Amino acid sequence: MAMHFIFSDTAVLLFDFWSVHSPAGMALSVLVLLLLAVLYEGIKVGKAKLLNQVLVNLPTSISQQTIAETDGDSAGSDSFPVGRTHHRWYLCHFGQSLIHVIQVVIGYFIMLAVMSYNTWIFLGVVLGSAVGYYLAYPLLSTA
């Protein structure tokens, strides 16, 4: 295995069954990794947007609700009960954790593909990352 970047139409990417031996196979592999890089950027933006949405929708302070309930002042309050708020928070946290795991796995797949030191693969990942950033980041500013 070469330890420097090379232009080649042959490579073994990630698994033995993903063995490329032709220019068409390399083009298809570059396209797959380009789309994975776009997906990675989309997941990154989606995770940030989801976290922002969760933080906006949760009560300002769960500890203030806990104090109010122990004082008996929350009977007339229209806020969420503490148990329900905690349950929502844990569900959102679990969802965020799953999204994070998916993002990490895709990121490591992309990194390992680049470590094949094939210049075409590297350029496909860089282009996919740029396209993903271009397409996904304007979504952060929309409500």
Curated annotation (Swiss-Prot):
Claim: Transmembrane is one of the keywords in the record: yes
Entry text on domains: The N-terminal domain may be involved in Cu(2+) acquisition from potential degradation products of proteins in the lysosome.
Gene field: SLC31A2
Cellular localisation: Membrane; Cytoplasmic vesicle membrane; Late endosome membrane; Lysosome membrane
InterPro entries named among the record's database cross-references: Cop_transporter (IPR007274)
Tissue: Ubiquitous with high expression in placenta and heart.
Oligomer status and interactors: Oligomer. Interacts with SLC31A1; this interaction stabilizes SLC31A2 and protects it from ubiquitination and the subsequent degradation.
Residues where Phosphoserine is found: 77
GO biological processes: copper ion import; copper ion transport; intracellular copper ion homeostasis; regulation of copper ion transmembrane transport
Annotated Pfam families: Ctr
Topology Extracellular: residue spans: 1-22, 115-119
Keywords: Copper, Copper transport, Cytoplasmic vesicle, Endosome, Ion transport, Lysosome, Membrane, Phosphoprotein, Transmembrane, Transmembrane helix, Transport, Ubl conjugation
One cellular component term from this protein's GO annotations in UniProt: late endosome membrane
Record-level Gene Ontology MF annotations: copper ion transmembrane transporter activity
Taxonomic superkingdom: Eukaryota
Function summary: Does not function as a copper(1+) importer in vivo. However, in vitro functions as a low-affinity copper(1+) importer. Regulator of SLC31A1 which facilitates the cleavage of the SLC31A1 ecto-domain or which stabilizes the truncated form of SLC31A1 (Truncated CTR1 form), thereby drives the SLC31A1 truncated form-dependent endosomal copper export and modulates the copper and cisplatin accumulation via SLC31A1.
Stated name of the protein: Protein SLC31A2
Membrane topology: Multi-pass membrane protein
Ranges per topology, Cytoplasmic: 44-93, 141-143
Post-translational modification as stated in the protein's UniProt record: Ubiquitinated; ubiquitination and the subsequent proteasomal degradation are prevent by SLC31A1 that stabilizes it.
Similarity field: Belongs to the copper transporter (Ctr) (TC 1.A.56) family. SLC31A subfamily.
Residues passing through the membrane, by range: 23-43, 94-114, 120-140
